Amino acid sequence: MNLNMRTDVEPRTEIPPVVITGLSGAGLSSAARVLEDMGWYVTQNIPSQFVVQLVELCADPHSPVDKIAIVSDVRSKEFSGSLEEVISELSGLGLKPLVVFMDARNDVLIKRFDNLRRTHPLQGSGTLLVGIEREREIMNQIKESADVVIDTSDLSIHDLRRSIELNFNGIANKLQHVTVQSFGFKHGSPRDTDLLIDVRFLPNPFWVPELRPFRGTDKPVSDYVLADEGAQKFLDNFTRMLRDMRPGFKHEGKNFITVSVGCTGGHHRSVAIAEELARRLREVPDLDVSVNHRDIARN
């Protein structure tokens, strides 16, 4: 097979190539299937020396493939260095990939491996936890430089699909993307976030009997939360701050920003504030905004 790239045409770069990587058991294959359903050409664990050539072929204006995703995991020999070299080479060719890192907590990964009765690829003669921690150490540098980190610890397959779809909403138009997610501190703080906000300083609708059964997406709760002067001042200030931060994020090549808004249970205050914050951010030009309520259905 001839993998030589034509040199007489400019590469097609409207949609950047995507590299999906992360921890074994964190949902790499599931993410790949979602992208396939979205019309991406997805290939898994091809030798690193072929990745650049394949992406170049797809970048050719005459190629029928306009969206390509490469899934690469720790089973690739000398994984970390190889993948970093591939990313660097593609960037030098003007084909800088979007790197998506799939992550999950150790206890969740152990449960998933146990349920499937599988051993970890780096486990050797040790325990599952030993294999997972070895992989974390190898993958840490890739995670730190990833454009998007998706923590699948608390996501169902449907939640994961929604997260992938939301993160890729604006990619074709090269828009900066902001995901505003609400959560409850009692369920743990999200690890896949850039900016974390605590709105427990606001009056809690939970203690208003007639509001307790509702959620922050319901008008009675939303009206109650947003009627507070502190809520309005916070929203004004934070929206202004994020507008001011955007050029810096853009300069650093960070086009995917996650803002996490937390209250106690993730049902009322954080949901109402996240919805209103997203509404305001949608008024900002060239910004793609999505909302995710992580804990709204939890007890």
From Swiss-Prot:
Keyword Nucleotide-binding among UniProt keywords: yes
Keyword annotations: ATP-binding, GTP-binding, Nucleotide-binding
One GO MF term: GTP binding
Keyword Nucleotide-binding recorded: yes
Source organism, top-level taxon: Bacteria
Residues engaged in binding ATP: G22, L23, S24, G25, A26, G27, L28, S29
A Pfam family assignment: RapZ-like_N
Binding of GTP, residues: D73, V74, R75, S76
Family as reported in the entry's similarity comment: Belongs to the RapZ-like family.
Task of the protein: Displays ATPase and GTPase activities.
NCBIfam families: PRK05416.1 (NF003828)
Name by which UniProt lists this protein: Nucleotide-binding protein DIP1313
Provenance organism: Corynebacterium diphtheriae (strain ATCC 700971 / NCTC 13129 / Biotype gravis)
